């Protein structure tokens, strides 16, 4: 099948779109990609909805997400179905649940194609974390690149996600094939601080962090958070570590950004200790791989090669969008999308609902 996946991540930068050829098991090829950036005004609308479960801010964010995705996906042709993640505004798997806004039924009507959406709710309702959901796709990617030794995929978006893959197993559902969890905050605290202090959306190229020094006292307080002592699988909301900025409030701009960047790397290093076997390499995806300071910190902290996924022919900007294209096909075929090793759910779960164009 030819599937089009779309992802609007916690970094709030825009909509990624990508085509994957797959049967929901193997990857046969990758197709065209696209990107639709959010304007500063649109990012402000999304930020206003973060951490909320209902109300006008949530409705405004949902309308924006649906409209932006319709624009981002309209130009793709020859697509059998669409995988639509939506925008996560709130995520409390042990509390109120999970909320991704955006109307999949309206999107199906606009695109005149079936849309698979609401990927996380079933997993959470059945006791899982609802995240990460990309690991089944990461397993397929490991097979596609011909990996023979255990490896990790590290996604550095607003939140960091780690997937440990043992490609010696034939299927991702087999116990031991996958372990996945959120490592901790990644780009989100840096982006928020850059916006608040300097009016910039991110630390471009790690330039601000490069001029600073990591404050070890703040780093130690950060690593003492209970989340890091929990065994995986486990997941985070974008705002779970909002107090991080308070830990660096008295520091200079450069020291504050360097410290938040160091916190991301330290959280990954601590999370890697949970891997069943030492991975041969860590393949980094997401916006964080463009930050050379963060990549250097990771390489110093880890005992294996740390490389962008482009080193193996994958597209680090589009991997999550590709993941939801792949997962959409799995949903359409009645295959599972999460398992105990990825979200902690008690059994295999095939999440996601399908909206057809004539249902809207």
Curated annotation (Swiss-Prot):
Top-level class of the enzyme under EC nomenclature: transferase
Matches recorded under InterPro entries: Anhydro_N_Ac-Mur_kinase, ATPase_NBD
Annotated catalysed reactions: 1,6-anhydro-N-acetyl-beta-muramate + ATP + H2O = N-acetyl-D-muramate 6-phosphate + ADP + H(+)
Annotated pathway: Amino-sugar metabolism; 1,6-anhydro-N-acetylmuramate degradation; Cell wall biogenesis; peptidoglycan recycling
Keyword annotations from UniProtKB, A to Z: ATP-binding, Carbohydrate metabolism, Kinase, Nucleotide-binding, Transferase
GO biological process: 1,6-anhydro-N-acetyl-beta-muramic acid catabolic process; amino sugar metabolic process; peptidoglycan turnover
Family per similarity comment: Belongs to the anhydro-N-acetylmuramic acid kinase family.
Protein name, UniProt field: Anhydro-N-acetylmuramic acid kinase
Native species: Ruegeria pomeroyi (strain ATCC 700808 / DSM 15171 / DSS-3)
Primary gene name: anmK
């Amino acid at each position: 099948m030819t599937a089009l996946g779309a992802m609007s991540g916690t970094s709030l930068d825009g909509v990624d779109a990508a085509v994957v050829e797959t049967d929901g098991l193997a990857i046969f090829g990758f197709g065209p990609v696209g990107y639709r950036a959010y304007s500063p005004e649109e990012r402000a609308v999304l930020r206003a909805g973060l951490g909320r479960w209902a109300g006008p801010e949530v409705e405004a964010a949902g309308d924006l997400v649906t409209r932006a995705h319709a624009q981002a996906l309209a130009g793709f042709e020859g697509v059998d179905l669409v995988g639509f993640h939506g925008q996560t505004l709130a995520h409390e798997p042990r509390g109120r649940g999970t909320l991704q806004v955006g109307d999949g039924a309206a999107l199906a009507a606009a695109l005149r194609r079936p849309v698979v959406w609401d990927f996380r709710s079933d997993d959470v309702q059945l006791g899982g974390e609802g995240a990460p959901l990309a690991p089944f796709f990461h397993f397929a990617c490991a097979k596609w690149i011909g990996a023979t030794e255990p490896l990790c995929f590290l996604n550095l978006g607003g939140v960091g996600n780690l997937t440990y893959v043992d490609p010696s197993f034939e299927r991702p559902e087999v116990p031991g094939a996958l372990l996945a969890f959120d490592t901790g905050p990644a780009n989100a605290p840096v982006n928020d601080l850059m916006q608040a202090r300097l009016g910039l959306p991110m630390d471009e190229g790690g330039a601000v962090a490069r001029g600073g020094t990591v404050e070890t006292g703040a780093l130690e307080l950060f690593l003492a958070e209970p989340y890091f002592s929990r065994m995986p699988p486990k997941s985070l909301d974008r705002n779970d570590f909002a107090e991080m900025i308070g830990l660096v409030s008295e520091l200079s701009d450069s020291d504050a950004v360097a410290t938040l960047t160091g916190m991301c790397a330290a959280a990954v290093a601590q999370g890697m200790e949970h891997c069943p076997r030492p991975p041969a390499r860590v393949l980094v995806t997401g916006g964080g791989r463009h930050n050379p300071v963060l990549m250097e910190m990771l390489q110093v902290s880890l005992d294996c090669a740390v490389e962008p996924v482009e080193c193996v022919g994958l597209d680090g900007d589009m991997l999550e969008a590709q993941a939801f294209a792949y997962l959409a096909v799995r949903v359409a075929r009645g295959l599972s999308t999460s398992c105990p090793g990825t979200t902690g759910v008690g059994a295999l779960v095939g999440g996601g609902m399908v909206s057809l164009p004539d249902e809207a």
